[in-house]
UniProtKB/Swiss-Prot annotation:
Organism listed in the record: Methanothermobacter marburgensis (strain ATCC BAA-927 / DSM 2133 / JCM 14651 / NBRC 100331 / OCM 82 / Marburg)
The gene coding this protein: mtrE
Protein name listed in UniProt: Tetrahydromethanopterin S-methyltransferase subunit E
Top-rank lineage group of the source organism: Archaea
Induction line: The first gene of the probable mtrEDCBAFGH operon.
Localization annotation: Cell membrane
TM region(s), chain numbering: 4-24, 60-80, 87-107, 140-160, 161-181, 234-254, 255-275
Amino acid sequence: MDPMITGLGVVALMGAAATIAGAAEDLESDVGSQSNPNSQVQLAPQMGHLHRIINKAVSGEPVAYGTWCGIAGSVAFVLMNSMQLPVIMAIAIGAVIAAMVHTTYAVTSHMGRIVSQSQFNQPLFMDMLVQHLGPIAGHGFIVTFCTVGLSYLMTLPIPGFAHPFPLPLLAVLWGITIGAIGSSTGDVHYGAEREYQQYPFGGGIPVAIHGDITTKAELGARNSMDVVHFCAKYGGPLTGFAFGAIVFLSFWNTIVFGITGGIISGLIIVLLLIILNNRLEVFARNRYGPYKEEE
């Protein structure tokens, strides 16, 4: 088979895995209030809003997912090389162990944060904590499995691949990357639209309203299940598309045009994206104008 066709097939598989991982990563951060919106949740009791929202951020998303993916990649690497387990099985076991560590940190972090807010009469809802562990572990498993999988594909002895870095290091690097993409792409949608639903959309989140979050859902008290259901319609898929496009566009040009041609085509793509982003922003500003205060 033509090496270029083989390489493009691997790149397509990597892009698909990255798309799934990106969507799951954003939804996991939404169900657990990780990264940017996290500070708004932990300020809510101080603003007089007692809530039933998970608040489990151990750290920022890049550091957290670099850790989870590094654990999964290290376990898979050992199982594949020491015990000669099949690749899929080794990666799955690594992702399960990473999900267990992830869940443990989620429990201790959430309980620690909520207990620290007890001086503001914020209770610890054990039923809410237990019910949300499944989505946290499940989405985390999908992210680490897909991320370690695309990292493994980079090490295949195929022209354009055969990366010199070992699998655990690649998994850490891609984990940091997917955490950064989820933090910069999906969290803006979550923080602006769902946590501050009582404010007009488009006005941003000024410091004066930090912690003044929405605590009532369409029926009953709002919890993180409501948030992740809402974000699955737009924020999650958008994050998956962003990460999938980054992975695909980072490899296909080298496979098709070679090293030198790939660098040149990559620069052209970056310039086109900058121009497109500028045109889109100018159009939006001219079409809708600046945000106006109510008179």
